[in-house]
């Protein structure tokens, strides 16, 4: 489920896009999926909580983070990115676990998450603003709904069940 989102995000923003933009779209997609479906929220929160699962997430994501953010942190080692992944995964888990409300809307959640995580990786402010603007102009709910439907169809085929409306 997690790996497929990078593929979907890549198709959305284009093959040769800025990797930081791809990271932003992918993480916003995860947060939006959790917000739109309580079952997915539970799955994500559990994945970010169960020790065996989160360790796998940390290891795989740290490799991706190093590829994406090494231009901003050229002196950082693989272990530095692993340690940073532990922290940014905590951002993700916390934001997934907390449903939006009238004060903390999805738009504010996405903007705050990106501001915090991109700052950790020392992405320049101007680039952060351009990425936030791009995300704000996406219909992230519609995109997440399409991804969710694709996910459910895949699950139906793999596990031979049917979801009813």
Question: At which residue positions do the language-model features occur?
Answer:
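C-terminal peripheral helix-coil segments that are non-catalytic and often amphipathic
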Residues: 67, 71, 101-165
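Short, basic, alpha-helical segments at the C-terminal edge of helix-turn-helix-like DNA-binding modules
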Residues: 1-6
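Generic structural signal for hydrophobic core residues of well-folded globular domains
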Residues: 9, 34-37, 92, 99, ...
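Secondary-structure edge/capping motif, primarily at the C-terminal ends of alpha-helices
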Residues: 9-13, 41, 95-103
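Short, hydrophobic secondary-structure boundary micro-motifs
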Residues: 41-46, 126-130
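Short, surface-exposed acidic
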Residues: 17, 74-81, 125-131
